[in-house]
Amino acid sequence: MCTHEDSRPSPSPLAAAAAAHTVPPQRSRRGTDTARSPPGARGGAAPRPMRVMIAPMDASHLAPLLTPAGWALLADLPPYDESTVLSVGARLREAGHPPEMVAAALTQQRLRTRAEAKFGPFASRMLFTPDALEQATRLVVSAHHAARYEHAGVQHVADLGCGIGGDAMALAGLGLRVLAVESDEATAALATVNLMVFPEVEVLCADALEVDLTARGIDAVFADPARRSHGHRIADPEQWSPALGRVLALRDDVGALGVKVAPGIDHAALPTDAHVQWASVGGEVVEAGIWCGPLAAEGPGRSALVLSDPPPASDDPRDAPSARVLRDPDCHDPSTPPVHLAPLADVGALGAYVHEPDGAAIRAGLVAHIAERLDAAPVGDRIAYLSGDALPDASLAPFVHSWRVREVLPLNLKMLKTRVREHDIGSLELHKRGVPVTPDAVRAAVRPHGQAHETWIMTRVGNAGDAQRARGAVIVVEPCEAPTVPVS
């Protein structure tokens, strides 16, 4: 059920359409009508009409799809193809479909194609706007959020700032009751459609901090404060909406609190008694999560969660991406600054390998821990490249990308251009940290046109405070075969 906290009448076209819309059921393999649920869902649930009482909003371009004709048109569209979209649109209009319905359906099909990276096959039955899709949590990450709540034994979760409903989907898929709260009326209406197959979910259009959690029997909260304003990221957590401090204050009423925050958050802004976990998917750092009370079973500290890509393609748990967690055993207060190690003395101290920790491990302050396990050192002062003579073992390999060092050159564009010509290099893979050059500028300067391939790491070697010994270098490397990691 989707309601407005103030129960205001006169719903907008989109809200009215969402109120009347029922997603057609899908025949399951068991022979019953059911909607497909995210991985881990305990059976499907028959969709049902929902009551919507929300204020007018400017999202009428989606309303044509929330009719039987609009939904049928969207369901019958072929896979989105940029090269044929104009001809498909013309054909549909010639067949008598209203132009606004055709435009909305084609736009939605394009967004669904983009959304597959976050929601896998479930994107094909969801509705999106560009902004809402960009801000949505990947389903593979939401599944890990939901697992914390299930393991904590909670029953009724308030998803504050639910967006289009990704985290609420994952929570409901594990059988938890969910109150999904969203202050933006248009986004709340989308969540209504995306979540209506889950009878355990109520969508509420309201200010997240105005909801009486106690009166509604809420025993856990997941919050996702808005971190953008007019298209720009907001760095200060106290300028988020709602402010991080106000969200953390909810622990006075509900001890089981989880908060999705920006991965670049300053460690000093973190609560001292929480566990904070940074997550990356396919090598991309996507978020940090603050976990409090029973949701932090591992205790206060910091960790990195590394998930493989792409998202799951079926309901079979064996198809789920692998997940690895690395924790700093010496950190019991996430607000403390990370340990910084002394760098190599100079280029001559480089080992046989260069290692780059995963971005989630870097954000979590785990570089020193990884260096210790590898018996390695940073190549430069506060540079996240490590060098040593050992490769990571299977337990550490998911958190480190390793290369074998072939040669070390000065960061001199004239000399590099000569190398490219003499070695017939036509393809360059460039990485950089700590030097004032860009890969594009280097590639343009050296002009690779040959047949060979090389990988260069451009970085600073040595202590930045020692001008005589620290210098820019190009480390020519080749990939190493990672140790086999058993699938969990």
Stretches found by the model and what they are:
Residues 2-4, 13, 22, 26-488:
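SAM-dependent transferase fold signal centered on methyltransferase-like domains
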